[in-house]
């Protein structure tokens, strides 16, 4: 409680000292009013006041003590206008006769006692078992309610609360709100709490504004001021200086960082006019890039009554253009390009990749960097060279357009006649390919090996319009095909691999789909031909009488021969034919993976064992004839080996090659296991005789285009070689 009373104002300057009360310390207590201590109220007479003043002057050497300043500061006792007590040291509400401070403090203590008693009663009630059960039932009922029902129930219960309960609820709700950092930050009241201070300090360190500071209620300190919005709130040096006035380094650092981000920004949204108004809610101007006009910045003051709203500022004439067109590089860095091509409306290229003839104007916004201009010029030059303004896949692709006309053989006239893609005038072809192959002037054989044909590629024989743009091959690329032994003793010959790698370096920029498909087929056929030649070379090393494949020259890459490589057709396992005579070991090399091919050395093929013969589907699968499995589901292998050509045809084997393969296999099985057919004079009578072999070979050659092509190319050599094989 207060120990000083309410003082009256002096009546006149002459009796100023009379109307002041002194401290009762060291003197007898003076009580004028039983309800107020040291009060000069109605019960005090003028005579008593005079005695009090005289007693104070005699006891303290004419110095009066003021209770407002602690009773220790001496004041001059002489009367005069200059010796009056200043009004700032006098307590307010001088004309009241009561003591509001003491009464308020008394009520406060009484309320505290009431609150303590209430809390004790609440604690005692919480320990009551009956009350606990009832409260748990109420809580269970409250949990099943919806949010609206809970709010309505709480509101109805609060209507019946007393003033003490209301104050208690207010205090509890405030404590609950302060425990939540979001509520503490957004709440307009109690914005000076510890959590709010920490959040505001964090925002100030980041250079952002505090929403709680903008929502703070009006107080005597800031009633006449208005929180002004900074036009560049994000990373603004002004905001940093406002939160830390003494730290100028942070402001300069933020200013430099903001300038750097603005210079390198490519896709951030800009600001429109009227976006930086002062909002009472969330601050939408915290990511603004452009400030207002200079006139608007000068007119902004701390007073809210004299500030001009930004919406009335028409000094910026940027309404009709992009909000971020403020520099010479904005068009290059802008996500929206000035061209009409949708492909250039991306962030990756800094220059348009496609030619735009309609684009004109070289204003300040179209100024390019030197490097960008150089890149654009190089792209345009490449498009003109490539043709029709198409985008090059790789601008660093080397172009080889040199011609090599040296060391061209004079005997190989077949390589220089006709529309041959690999003729001696084509750029980039090794000169060694023109060496005479030993086959005379026949141009079909060489053309079948390397000619792709104008019908497939749509080109002509002009060397300058070569469709493939083949880079120069190594001089040793085809040398392996010209050695006496063929150079293919090792299947993984490095020279052959070099040749295939050189053929893989073709320029495919100007090829359409059909040309690319034909090129892939040609490369596949060449690979098959090379593998076949490698197998034939291995067989020739075992046969002294084998034909030297070195005479083939470059014609070894013929697609006609490639048709025999790796084929597992039934025809490859028939009796000696024109093809087998023409190419010794070809049947053995082609049928190495099958069961029907015969060895060129005269050896028999491997006959399946009894376990395989018992499983007819597996046996047919081994013979590559599994398509006829349903035809022999009910047949035994012993019945099958006794069948003839007519019986197989009745079983549904309509293909002549399949029947011949079956008959040959059946004959081998009968020979191995000693089974004889009725009327069989000699082993193998189930197979057609020599005349039938010749007729069948002629039919087979008529069915196969590849065999006919080989017959024409060999030119009778195959017929001459077939006679000793037939005698065998």
From Swiss-Prot:
Protein name from the UniProt record: RNA-binding protein VTS1
Pfam family, any one: SAM_2
Coiled coil: none
InterPro entries: SAM (IPR001660), SAM/pointed_sf (IPR013761), SMAUG/VTS1_RNA-bind (IPR050897), VTS1_SAM (IPR037635)
Region (Disordered) location: 1-41, 57-101, 210-230, 261-344, 456-482, 536-608, 677-728
Main location: cytoplasm
Stretches assigned to the SAM domain: 611-672
Biased composition (Acidic residues): 698-708
Functional note: RNA-binding protein involved in post-transcriptional regulation through transcript degradation.
Keywords: Cytoplasm, Nucleotide-binding, Protein transport, RNA-binding, Transport
GO biological process terms held by the UniProt record: nuclear-transcribed mRNA poly(A) tail shortening; protein transport
Extent of the signal sequence: none
Subcellular location: Cytoplasm, Cytosol; Cytoplasm, P-body
Alphabetized PROSITE patterns for the sequence: SAM_DOMAIN (PS50105)
Composition bias, Polar residues: 11-25, 277-286, 334-344, 456-469
């Amino acid at each position: 409680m207060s120990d000083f009373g309410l003082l009256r104002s002096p009546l006149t300057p002459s009796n100023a000292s009379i109307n002041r009360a002194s401290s009762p310390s060291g003197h007898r207590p003076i009580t004028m009013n039983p309800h107020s201590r040291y009060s000069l109220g109605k019960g005090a007479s003028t005579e008593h006041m005079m005695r009090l003043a005289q007693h104070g002057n005699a006891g303290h050497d004419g110095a009066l003590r003021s209770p407002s300043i602690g009773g220790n500061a001496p004041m001059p006792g002489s009367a005069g206008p200059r010796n009056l007590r200043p009004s700032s040291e006098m307590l307010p509400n001088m004309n009241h006769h009561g003591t509001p401070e003491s009464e308020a403090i008394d009520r406060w203590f009484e309320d505290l006692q009431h609150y303590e008693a209430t809390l004790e009663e609440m604690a005692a009630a919480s320990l009551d078992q009956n009350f606990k059960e009832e409260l748990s039932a109420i809580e269970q009922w409250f949990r099943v309610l919806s949010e609206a029902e809970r709010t309505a129930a709480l509101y109805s219960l609060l209507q019946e609360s007393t003033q003490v309960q209301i104050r208690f609820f207010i205090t509890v709700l405030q404590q609950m709100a302060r425990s939540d950092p979001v509520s503490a930050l957004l709440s307009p009241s109690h914005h000076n709490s510890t959590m709010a201070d920490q959040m505001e300090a964090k925002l100030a360190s980041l250079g952002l504004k505090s929403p709680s500071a903008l929502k703070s209620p009006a107080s005597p300190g800031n009633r006449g001021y208005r929180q002004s919005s900074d036009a560049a709130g994000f990373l603004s040096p002004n905001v940093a200086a406002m939160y830390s006035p003494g730290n100028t380094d942070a402001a300069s650092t933020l200013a430099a960082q903001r300038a750097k981000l603005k210079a390198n920004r490519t896709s951030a949204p800009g600001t429109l006019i009227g976006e930086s108004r002062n909002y009472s809610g969330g601050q939408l101007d915290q990511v603004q890039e452009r400030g207002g006009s200079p006139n608007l910045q000068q007119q902004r003051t701390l007073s809210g009554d004299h500030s001009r709203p930004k919406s009335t500022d028409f000094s910026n004439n940027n309404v009709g253009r992009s909000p971020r067109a403020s520099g010479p590089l904005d068009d290059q860095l802008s996500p929206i390009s000035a061209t009409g091509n949708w492909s250039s409306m991306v962030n990756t290229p800094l220059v348009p990749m496609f030619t735009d003839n309609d684009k004109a104007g070289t204003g300040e916004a179209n100024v390019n960097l030197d490097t960008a201009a150089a890149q654009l010029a190089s792209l345009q030059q490449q498009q003109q060279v490539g043709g029709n303004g198409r985008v090059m896949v790789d601008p660093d692709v080397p172009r080889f357009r040199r011609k090599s006309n040296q060391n061209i053989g004079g005997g190989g006239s077949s390589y220089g006649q006709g529309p041959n893609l690999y003729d001696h005038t084509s750029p980039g072809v090794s000169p060694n390919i023109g060496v005479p192959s030993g086959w005379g002037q026949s141009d079909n054989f060489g053309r079948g090996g390397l000619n792709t044909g104008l019908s497939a590629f749509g080109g002509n024989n002009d060397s300058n319009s070569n469709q493939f743009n083949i880079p120069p091959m190594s001089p040793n690329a085809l040398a392996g095909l010209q050695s006496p032994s063929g150079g293919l003793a090792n299947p993984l010959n490095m020279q052959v691999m070099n040749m295939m790698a050189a053929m893989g370096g073709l320029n495919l920029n100007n090829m359409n789909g059909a040309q690319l498909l034909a090129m892939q087929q040609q490369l596949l056929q060449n690979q098959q031909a090379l593998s076949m030649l490698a197998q034939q070379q291995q067989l020739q090393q075992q046969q002294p009488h084998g034909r030297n494949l070195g005479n083939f020259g470059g014609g070894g890459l013929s697609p006609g021969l490639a048709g025999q490589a790796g084929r597992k057709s039934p025809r490859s396992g028939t009796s000696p034919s024109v093809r087998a005579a023409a190419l010794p070991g070809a049947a053995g090399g082609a049928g190495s993976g099958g069961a029907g091919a015969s060895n060129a050395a005269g050896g028999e093929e491997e006959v399946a064992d009894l376990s395989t013969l018992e499983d007819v589907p597996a046996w047919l699968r081994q013979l590559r004839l599994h398509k006829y499995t349903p035809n022999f589901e009910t047949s035994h292998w012993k019945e099958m080996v006794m069948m003839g050509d007519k019986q197989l045809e009745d079983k549904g084997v309509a293909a002549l090659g399949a029947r011949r393969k079956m008959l040959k296999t059946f004959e081998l099985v009968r020979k191995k296991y000693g089974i004889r057919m009725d009327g069989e004079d000699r082993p193998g009578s189930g197979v057609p005789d020599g005349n039938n072999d010749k007729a069948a070979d002629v039919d087979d050659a008529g069915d196969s285009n590849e065999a006919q092509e080989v017959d024409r190319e060999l030119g009778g050599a195959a017929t001459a070689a077939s006679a000793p094989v037939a005698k065998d």
